[in-house]
Design a protein with these regions (language model features):
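Short, well-structured alpha-helical segments in soluble
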Residues: 75-90, 110, 292-300
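Anaerobic metallocofactor- and corrinoid-dependent redox/one-carbon enzyme cores
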Residues: 3-24, 32-45, 97-99, 114-122, ...
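N-terminal beta-loop-helix "entrance" segment that forms/cooperates
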Residues: 54-85, 245-255
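Low-complexity, highly charged intrinsically disordered N-terminal segments
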Residues: 29-62
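Extended, charge-rich low-complexity interaction segments
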Residues: 86-92, 153, 178-185, 190, ...
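Cap/lid and interdomain-hinge subdomains that line or gate substrate/regulatory clefts
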Residues: 15-29, 55-59, 123-254
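Flexible loop/turn segments at secondary-structure boundaries
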Residues: 29-31, 67-70, 101-104, 125-126, ...
């Protein structure tokens, strides 16, 4: 009989009694990890002090790398190696003060057998809350139980009690009483429209173009064809290298025409001459070529929406994609002709763009675009990061702040929009944003996500509000002043309810001219999704019936 050398299976260590193990998922980009490490270190120290005060020991699951200058897990491979050294049944806390790539720790968390808590610091300095929400959405999609908790420094009673509960029971449940299922809808014009558009989509189909899938480890942002196809939505898988190749075919003259159009529309470009730290005309020229190239490729493939990964694939190749993305999402935008000059592409309409190839946003943007257009509303839509927030004048006002672009109509027009160089920490080749302060008004917010093996959508109402200029600037300085900001007040949803429920780092927003119209649009959107077979959840205070 043949004898084979069998592998020696790894035996994880036993958990130490009354001990919590911690891990920290980070960025792939070394500059981001090094820059953010001091803030992460402070959060870990604050958390350790709280855990110790509650009578537990804390053991960090991986060492700080003095050569790299940080203590983050910075790749999927590194994460797998770290989890080999951790007791499988130990209580585990994922500590995040930064934007992190969920796939760095997903393999380990998926097979971990002990309770998992994801914590973040309540701060806008770096996107730790955004990182927490992305990991929460990814674990939800993976079907892995977990708990979440957030605090400024873990000295407050609310956070300490939450930590105590999790340490003693292995679970922590927050109030999500603001969420309820969709009741039967009345037979009105909005319901009829939503149902009709859903049936049209399912029957006639739509194509979303994906320029490289899986941006920045966002497992939650990948929706498999098996979930999309029953809605009538199909993917055209495209390569970012093809986008760069098409950019090279765009003439300088065509790109300059885009710049001239934007200058005439009143947009401000904050330019300089230092390529390493400032926005330059050369960077802008490249971005306008990307805008033209994206529309031409979309026309080639008959796309109904498009997403560009950018990070990581293009960040070392061309300037940021954000300016092109913001232009694509707006109705009024620089005209782009077919290669032979015979046709204007997607004339008089946006080409919905889903930032960071977030396919939950793709579905949502496609639905919103068709519905808002049919209702005669501005179909410009965008996603935002749920970055942070604080009370102002007796109301909790969220900072919704996507990393680079919104449609100009959300700012009140191009004359109220501006472009600044993207932060070098994330964008080594620069490129400009399409930024501004979102105009006050009524919005519908939403999020499509995967849970329990099927598609769900949360729908809610909010108001974009105006804050004094000094408060706006304070919030921008507390986060990323280069990026577009929306001051948002959710209707009937508290800060902690929203954090406990939301299953993604992103949410979608679209404007309506007044509250009554926004309520009608939400009702039609609920009917649209329900007819598609997506499970609809209503969040907060809504005027659902006419």
């Amino acid at each position: 009989m043949t004898t084979y050398a069998l592998p020696q299976l790894h035996q994880p260590p036993a958990a130490e009694p009354h001990t919590v193990y911690t891990v920290a998922s980070g960025d792939l980009r070394p500059a981001a990890n090094v820059t953010c490490w001091p803030t992460q270190e402070k959060l870990e120290n604050d958390l350790a002090a709280a855990v110790t005060d509650l009578g537990w020991k804390v053991r960090r699951g991986h060492a700080v790398d003095e050569v790299k200058g940080h203590g983050f897990i910075d790749s999927q491979c590194a994460g797998i190696e770290v989890f080999k050294t951790l007791p499988k049944d130990a209580p585990l806390i994922v500590v995040e003060a930064v934007w992190q790539y969920s796939h760095h720790v997903l393999a380990g968390l998926r097979s971990h057998e002990g309770p998992i808590l994801v914590v973040a610091n309540w701060s806008g300095e770096f996107p730790g809350l955004v990182g927490l929400l992305n990991l929460a959405g990814s674990l939800t999609k993976a079907g892995r139980d977990y708990s979440v908790l957030w605090s400024t420094d873990f000295t407050d009673d609310w956070a300490r009690e939450g930590l105590r509960t999790w340490l003693e029971t292995g679970t922590l449940t927050h109030d999500t009483g603001h969420v309820r299922p969709l009741p039967p809808l009345s037979e009105d014009a909005e319901t009829e429209l939503g149902v009709a558009l859903a049936r049209q989509l399912r029957e006639e189909k739509a194509i979303i173009g994906v320029f490289d899938e899986g941006c920045m480890g966002m497992y939650n942002a990948i929706i498999d064809d098996e979930f999309l196809n029953p809605l009538g939505i199909y993917k055209e898988r495209l390569s970012q290298s093809a986008l760069v190749a098409e950019m090279k075919k765009v003439s300088d003259e065509e790109a300059r025409a885009v710049r001239a159009w934007l200058d005439d529309a009143g947009m401000t470009f904050h330019t300089g001459t230092d390529e390493a730290t400032e926005l330059t005309d050369a960077q802008l020229l490249s971005q306008f070529k990307m805008y033209i190239a994206a529309l031409r490729i979309a026309d080639d493939f008959g796309l109904d929406a498009v997403g560009i990964q950018y990070q990581q694939g293009l960040k070392d190749t061309v300037p940021a994609s954000d300016l092109a993305e913001g232009l694509l999402n707006n109705v009024q935008r620089p005209p782009v002709l077919s290669r032979d000059g015979s046709r204007e592409l997607y004339a008089g309409a946006p080409l919905p763009h889903f930032n960071e190839v977030d396919e939950g946003v793709a579905v949502d943007s496609l639905v919103t675009n068709r519905l808002w257009t049919a209702m005669g509303l501005d179909p410009a839509t965008t996603l935002h990061d749920i970055r942070w927030g604080e009370e102002y004048d007796g109301r909790f006002v969220w900072v919704f702040e996507i990393s680079g672009s919104v449609p100009a109509s959300h700012n009140g027009g191009y004359d109220k929009s501006y472009s600044m160089r993207q932060p070098p920490m994330f964008f080594p080749l620069g490129g400009g944003t399409l930024s501004g302060v979102s105009k006050p008004g009524e919005i519908v917010w939403s999020r499509v996500f995967l849970m329990d093996g099927r598609l769900h959508v949360d729908l809610g109402r909010a108001s974009a509000v105006e804050l004094p200029e000094e408060e706006t600037w304070r919030r921008l300085e507390a986060t990323n002043h280069q990026w577009p900001i929306m001051h948002a007040v959710l209707h009937g949803v508290t800060r902690d309810q929203f954090m406990a429920r939301h299953r993604a780092n992103h949410l979608n927003v679209a404007y309506a001219p007044d509250a009554a119209t926004a309520d009608k649009a939400l009702r039609a959107k609920a009917a649209f999704f329900a007819e598609l077979g997506v499970e609809v959840h209503l969040c907060g205070d809504l005027a659902l019936q006419p």
